[in-house]
């Protein structure tokens, strides 16, 4: 249906006019329109939903002369369909019936009561438990970008001023927003096209003055200087648009969003998008969450702890004091064994971070309050354990945990032990919490005694032995008599329902009692809902302190998890130095050692002011890439406060980690593998410093031999001489092994292999010096390349090596490289013989025969 039809409402039925008016207010969303027990979708919404949800597309009569495409879903199954839609990046407006159909003249009154978008989820059923769900906004300035993210499910609000396209790309990969807001004139769509939940917003929503006003209203302040963000103009424009969007979609106060933090790149080790991808921090190269650094490190016992750990992994710190604080906490938890008891207690806390967000939005359910109550009950035990700790950071966290005896006592009095899922039907408020509620409940529940007495009385009065007094939700209270005795009922009995073998009646007395009970039930439920709403008002004043409790508990979970990993995997505490360099003894790759079927071979690395670059050579499949990645991962782990898989690690200042490892075509941008490789290389050469860790793997593979070797040589020379970056430079160009003779601070190391006949055994051990050969043909044979191809390759290798050494191969040199020489008669004869079948005499005769064939 086009926009002209939407505006011409008079030709539609009253119900469709109501629908189209609401749809016009939410043009970019699917509108779930409540009709009885179903949510219906019409026109284009129905077609889209039918395709995305695999539901039937039908038609509902005509309106305006045309059939109306329609699709519907049952209201009781809506959460499952919503989850699928938000995963696809769709937003949904939910329109409910708020009027009474019995009294309505025309269409029942309806209202959009809830808006669900991928980036503003707070409902437990729709969220990924162990992943942040971020709403982001980006604003492009003349120079640089403003970027803001908000986790509505926790209240965490962060902004960043990003100087370049590369910095924005890295932030998008780090945060992986579920929904991204961008302005109408955003000029770099190639950066954001891959994000499913993109939302284009009008330019006025990014107006600076409008945005500042929006933020000041939210935080209740006169200016933003107290947050240290007053000069972050571009990111404040992004933040203001984001805040406007959240208010529009949530349609309620947002008290849990009470601060905003500026992310400064200088506070953490900078990881560009390629590095995050190549190191497989939280997502593997295949897109899985298995076999990643996070999958090995994460044994946290709470979902909020898991989310914090992933944020730490993507944001390794540079401040040594903060890192040492974490290390000392982990060390004490490990040495005392306290981490085991602490983890058992933390596990009982649940996901209070998200519970508090739902509390702030007043969308919390009864079981959320019960979980919060249980968490507050565990808190004194956790604090008591931490009282015995000496580590300064553990003491600070213990203070941040806080005390909430009054809130705990309130929730214990107010909420039943095992409340129902919803407040809708009551049964949530505990008996004894409110005397008036108890009285109404007693009246509505105490009818059991009354009905039993009435049943006995009526049996005596009528002499009907089969008489029963009962109740059902459809017909209310009734007196039931078997059909055989129905002739005995008094004249005052009024027939209410006829069944196969019984008759049901109502009497004036029973009718009066029914009205009284139903009235008391309604009043009890109304009062219970009122008391429920008051609970929010009683808890919310402590929201900030409760959020601090959740934050401290999350960090305790991560630190106890680090102690658990160190104990289980034999990790050691790394030392931090103010002198540039990385020294690792017996280092191991944290992921490969966990998934490998064979024992992992530990390896050392030494980078210092006098040993800035290692040229890494060795056989393909020998472990060069694994070795380089393990150095980067150990360095990163040390900077998040974790212990590391090494006997010893001494690590100096690191400002960035770069990786140029592997590449594939970027088809979306029309870039070849070689172009991707060179773009990543250019980024490293422009941005690396003397404190950067650089991993360069096989530069120059995507072009001709001499072009590739020249580029690799020049890049290595630039890194070593101009930048002085700490570099591991793996290459298959053996000419580069001459660099140590020409440049100070450059050294050769290699991964060894042992060759036996036509087979090869990889030793995976790093040794000083250059490798002697690459063993490419042996690796090809292991990969299953046909034997005749390997044989031809060996011949061609000899031919090329002889040519390089100036050997006159005359006829053979005339052969094109794509040709394989025919085997000689002697070779053919030898291939046809099994030596085990020859007698001594036959063997002697064969020798003479072969001599003649040469």
Curated annotation (Swiss-Prot):
SUPFAM superfamilies: DNA repair protein MutS, domain I, DNA repair protein MutS, domain II, DNA repair protein MutS, domain III, P-loop containing nucleoside triphosphate hydrolases
Pfam hit, one: MutS_III
Alphabetical keyword list: ATP-binding, DNA damage, DNA repair, DNA-binding, Nucleotide-binding
UniProt-listed Gene3D superfamilies: 1.10.1420.10, 6.10.140.430, DNA repair protein MutS, domain I, MutS, connector domain, P-loop containing nucleotide triphosphate hydrolases
MF annotations from Gene Ontology: ATP binding; ATP-dependent DNA damage sensor activity; damaged DNA binding; mismatched DNA binding
HAMAP family, per the entry: MutS
Sequence similarity: Belongs to the DNA mismatch repair MutS family.
Protein name: DNA mismatch repair protein MutS
Species annotation: Shewanella amazonensis (strain ATCC BAA-1098 / SB2B)
């Amino acid at each position: 249906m086009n926009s002209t039809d939407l505006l011409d409402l008079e030709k539609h039925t009253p119900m469709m006019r109501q629908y189209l008016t609401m749809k016009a207010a939410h043009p970019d969303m699917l509108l779930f329109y409540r009709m009885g027990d179903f949510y219906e979708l019409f026109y284009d919404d129905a077609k889209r939903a039918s395709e995305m949800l695999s539901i039937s597309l039908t038609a509902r009569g005509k309106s305006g002369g045309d059939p109306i495409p329609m699709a519907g879903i049952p209201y009781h199954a809506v959460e499952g369909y919503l989850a699928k839609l938000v995963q696809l990046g769709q937003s949904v407006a939910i329109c409910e019936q708020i009027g009474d159909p019995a009294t309505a003249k025309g269409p029942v009154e309806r209202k959009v009561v809830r808006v669900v978008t991928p980036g503003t989820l707070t409902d437990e059923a729709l969220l990924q438990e162990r992943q942040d769900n971020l709403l982001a906004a980006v604003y492009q300035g003349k120079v640089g970008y403003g970027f803001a993210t908000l986790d509505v499910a926790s209240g965490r609000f962060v902004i960043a001023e990003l100087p370049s396209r590369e910095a924005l790309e890295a932030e998008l990969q780090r945060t992986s927003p579920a929904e991204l807001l961008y302005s109408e004139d955003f000029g770099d769509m190639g950066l954001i096209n891959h994000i499913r939940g993109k939302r284009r917003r009008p330019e006025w929503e990014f107006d600076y003055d409008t945005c500042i006003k929006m933020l000041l209203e939210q935080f209740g302040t006169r200016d933003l200087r107290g947050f240290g963000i007053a000069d972050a103009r571009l990111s404040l424009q992004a933040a203001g648009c984001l805040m406007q969007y959240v208010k529009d979609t949530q349609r309620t106060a947002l008290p849990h969003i009470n601060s905003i933090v500026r992310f400064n790149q200088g506070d953490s080790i900078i990881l560009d998008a390629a590095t995050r991808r190549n190191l497989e921090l939280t997502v593997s190269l295949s897109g899985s969450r298995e076999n990643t650094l996070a999958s090995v490190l994460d044994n946290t016992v709470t979902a909020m702890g898991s989310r914090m750990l992933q944020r730490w992994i993507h944001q390794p710190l540079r401040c040594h004091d903060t890192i040492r604080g974490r290390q000392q906490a982990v060390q004490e938890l490990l040495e005392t064994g306290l981490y085991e008891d602490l983890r058992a207690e933390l596990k009982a806390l649940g996901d209070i971070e998200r519970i508090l967000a739902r509390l702030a939005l007043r969308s919390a359910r009864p079981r959320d309050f019960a979980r919060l109550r249980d968490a507050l009950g565990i808190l004194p035990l956790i604090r008591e354990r931490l009282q015995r700790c000496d580590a300064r950071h553990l003491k600070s966290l213990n203070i941040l945990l806080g005390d909430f005896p009054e809130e705990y006592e309130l929730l214990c009095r107010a909420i039943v032990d095992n409340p129902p899922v919803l407040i809708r039907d009551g049964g949530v408020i505990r008996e004894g919490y409110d005397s008036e509620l108890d009285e109404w409940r007693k009246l509505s529940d105490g009818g059991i005694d009354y009905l039993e007495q009435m049943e006995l009385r009526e049996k005596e009065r009528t002499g009907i032995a089969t008489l029963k007094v009962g109740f059902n939700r459809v017909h209310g209270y009734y007196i039931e008599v078997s059909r055989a005795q129905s002739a005995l009922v008094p004249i005052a009995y009024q027939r209410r329902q006829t069944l196969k073998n019984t008759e049901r009646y109502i009497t004036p007395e029973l009718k009066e009692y029914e009205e009284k009970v139903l009235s008391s039930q309604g009043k009890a439920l109304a009062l219970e809902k009122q008391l429920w709403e008051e609970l929010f008002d009683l808890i919310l004043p402590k929201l900030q302190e409760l959020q601090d409790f959740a934050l401290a508990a999350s960090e305790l979970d991560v630190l106890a998890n680090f102690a658990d990993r160190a104990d289980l995997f034999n990790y050691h505490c790394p030392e931090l130095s103010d002198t540039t360099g990385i020294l690792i003894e017996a280092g191991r790759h944290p992921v490969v050692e966990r998934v490998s079927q064979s024992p992992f071979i530990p390896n050392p690395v030494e980078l210092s002011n006098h040993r800035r670059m290692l040229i890494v050579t060795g056989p393909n499949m020998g472990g060069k890439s694994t070795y380089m990645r393990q150095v980067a991962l150990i360095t990163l782990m040390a900077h998040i406060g974790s212990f590391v898989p090494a006997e010893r690690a001494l690590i100096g200042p690191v400002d960035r980690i770069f990786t140029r490892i592997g590449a594939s075509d970027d088809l979306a941008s029309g870039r070849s593998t070689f172009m991707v490789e060179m773009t990543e290389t250019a980024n490293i050469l422009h941005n690396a410093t003397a404190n950067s860790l650089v991993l360069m793997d096989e530069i120059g593979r995507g072009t001709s031999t001499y072009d590739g070797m020249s580029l690799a040589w020049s890049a290595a020379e630039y890194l070593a001489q101009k930048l002085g970056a700490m570099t591991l430079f793996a290459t298959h160009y053996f000419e580069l092994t001459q660099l140590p003779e020409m440049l100070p601070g450059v050294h050769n190391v290699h991964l060894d292999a042992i060759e036996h006949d036509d087979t090869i055994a990889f030793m995976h051990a790093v040794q000083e010096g250059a490798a002697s050969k690459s063993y490419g043909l042996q690796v090809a044979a292991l990969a299953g390349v046909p034997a005749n191809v390997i044989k031809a390759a060996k011949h061609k290798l000899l031919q090329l090596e002889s040519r390089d050494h100036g050997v006159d191969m005359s006829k053979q040199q005339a052969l094109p490289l794509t040709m394989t020489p025919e085997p000689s008669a002697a070779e053919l004869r030898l291939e046809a013989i099994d030596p085990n079948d020859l007698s001594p005499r036959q063997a002697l005769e064969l020798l003479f025969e072969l001599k003649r064939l040469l």
